[in-house]
Amino acid sequence: MAVKKQKMQKYRQVSKVTSTEHSRMVREIFATITERYDFLNHFLSLRRDIVWRRSAVREMHFFQSKRLLDVATGTGDLAIEAIRQHPEIQVMGLDIVPEMVTIGRRKIEKKHLSGRIRFMLGDAMILPFPDDCFDVAGIAFGIRNIPDRPQALREMKRVVVPGGQVIILEMNFPRHRLFRLFYDLYLNRILPVMAGAFSRNPAAYHYLADSIMHFPPPVEFAAMMREAGLTAVEKHPLTLGITYLYIGVKPDRNGLQK
């Protein structure tokens, strides 16, 4: 069923905005798509987003605090999947968009997970947690929406225990020419039209396409993780490389990986 749309909004390209403008734009965009966010994620990815999250959670190791920090949690899908696979853990979900947090809380209440998952408002670039308090810090499809990615990576590294993991799941614009042409057509032509049938702010999905196309290639992002102080950095292509799973480890205080 189509929804009533608001007046068509336009957003500047990611590469042409300041960090402050980027943060404000992200809050505005995601505040307008919360009610249909889960449906559109599943629909537009042909439900591959569910499989990708499962793959990310399978790589998580909980050995000390038994706690996961889900950064840019959105409506909490990564947090919920983590609890499904690791019933012994507790999850803290953090997001900068109040409307997303509200939807996330409703979801976990319906699933009777309020005692296992908590949500709070917060900025990934200034995490409100002490050092060394989570086994894993993860973020699914959110790192590209953060203006200062190196700072967010440093913060995620800071709050995990020595030997803990930073796990990133993010979309990728393929480099293979033929696949790139098809994906460009999908992102810039097909996706906005499909989203427009269901979203009251279809322009948000133009931003989605733009943010994917301007995200660093896997080799560059993996290097960014190393520069943030993470070790044993891995990058794994999923579904022909349209999504990548990145894993990094916080070294111990002697600089060694546990």
PLM features per residue range, with description:
Residues A2-E28:
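N-terminal auxiliary segments of SAM/dcSAM-dependent transferases
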Residues R24, L169-A228, E234:
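C-terminal alpha-helical "lid/dimerization" subdomain adjacent to the S-adenosyl-L-methionine
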Residues R36-F39, L46-K66, E81:
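Conserved alpha-helix/loop element of class I SAM-dependent methyltransferases that forms part
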Residues Y37, A137-G138:
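Hydrophobic beta-strand segment of the Class I
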Residues R67-I126:
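Class I SAM-dependent methyltransferase SAM/SAH-binding core
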Residues M125-V136:
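A short acidic, Gly/Pro-enriched loop at the edge of an enzyme's catalytic core
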Residues P150-P162:
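A short glycine-rich, Lys/Arg-flanked "PGG" loop and its adjoining helix->strand segment in the class I
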Residues G229-K258:
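Core SAM-dependent methyltransferase catalytic element
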